[in-house]
């Protein structure tokens, strides 16, 4: 029988590595909050236009490196390949430009192949 493997671009994280990552994440959060960054989290799934508008339709990331699919309503959805575009969408949607400057910190999975 074929051995099942994690999907390309993903991996399993064992307990020791997970604990180490959590410790680093706690330190990161403490430092960024100390220096006035706001912790934010954006969805792993975004409308593909979020990335096309900020990265460009012809960029290698869009053309070759994203996990993109259509949902049941035929909307094109992309797994987040990087963090800047979702932060820009977040910033605009929440009208945060009214209170500048803004500093954001974010951590999360990014998906490219």
Where are these predicted regions, by residue range?
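TRNA-recognition modules of translation machinery and tRNA-sensing kinases, especially anticodon-binding
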Residues: 1-113
């Amino acid at each position: 029988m074929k051995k099942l493997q994690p999907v390309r671009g993903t991996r399993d994280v064992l307990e020791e590595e997970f604990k180490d990552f959590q410790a680093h994440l706690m330190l990161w959060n403490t430092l960024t909050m100390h220096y006035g960054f706001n912790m934010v989290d954006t969805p792993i799934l975004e409308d593909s236009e979020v990335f096309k508008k900020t990265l460009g339709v012809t960029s290698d990331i869009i053309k070759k490196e994203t996990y993109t699919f259509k949902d049941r309503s035929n909307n094109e959805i992309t797994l987040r390949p990087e963090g800047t575009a979702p932060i820009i969408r977040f910033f605009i949607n929440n009208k945060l430009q009214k209170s500048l400057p803004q500093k954001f910190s974010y951590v999360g999975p990014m998906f490219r192949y």
